[in-house]
UniProtKB/Swiss-Prot annotation:
Main localization of the protein described in the UniProt heading: secreted
GO CC, any one term: extracellular region
Coiled coil: none
Keyword line: Antimicrobial, Disulfide bond, Fungicide, Plant defense, Secreted, Signal
Signal peptide: 1-28
Protein name (record): Defensin-like protein 296
Species per Swiss-Prot/TrEMBL record: Arabidopsis thaliana
Organism classification: Eukaryota, Viridiplantae, Streptophyta, Embryophyta, Tracheophyta
Disulfide bonds: 34-52, 40-57, 45-59, 81-102, 87-107, 95-109
UniProt family annotation: Belongs to the DEFL family.
Subcellular location: Secreted
One of the protein's GO biological processes: killing of cells of another organism
Length: 110
C-alpha cells in the first residue's frame, strides 16, 4: 500500500514540474518564393499590399503615392490653424500616417 502512495506522489510531482516548465513557442512565417509581385497575390497580408522582395513575398506597410495624396486632402470641416500646435492632437488617430501639420491655414494629414 505504501508503494502505491509513493508512486502516486512521484507521479504528481512529475506532473507539477512538467506544468511549471515553459516550453518556447516558435512563430511561423509564411514564406512564398516569387519572381514578380504578381506571384504574391495569394499571400494573406490583412489589407497591406504584398511585394516580391529578394525572391520572397513580403507584406508591406508603405503607402502608395495615391494613398498619400488622398490622405493630404483637407476635409470640408478641417480646423483652421496658424501653427501645428493649434490642431487637435486627436487628429492623429484619423490620419492614415498618424501625423498632421498646419498647411495653408488648415490642419492636414501628412
Amino acid at each position: 500500500m505504501a508503494s502505491k502512495i509513493t508512486i502516486f506522489f512521484v507521479l504528481a510531482l512529475v506532473v507539477v514540474c512538467t506544468m511549471m516548465v515553459c516550453i518556447p513557442t516558435a512563430t511561423a512565417e509564411l514564406v512564398l518564393p516569387c519572381k514578380t509581385t504578381y506571384d504574391c497575390v495569394n499571400l494573406p497580408c490583412l489589407g497591406r499590399p504584398p511585394l516580391c522582395i529578394n525572391g520572397q513575398c513580403k507584406c508591406t506597410t508603405t503607402l502608395t503615392h495615391q494613398a498619400k495624396l488622398d490622405n493630404l486632402r483637407t476635409m470640408n470641416d478641417a480646423k483652421t490653424c496658424k501653427y501645428t500646435s493649434d490642431c487637435d492632437p486627436r487628429m492623429r488617430y484619423s490620419c492614415v500616417s498618424g501625423s498632421y501639420i498646419c498647411l495653408n491655414g488648415f490642419c492636414t494629414c501628412t
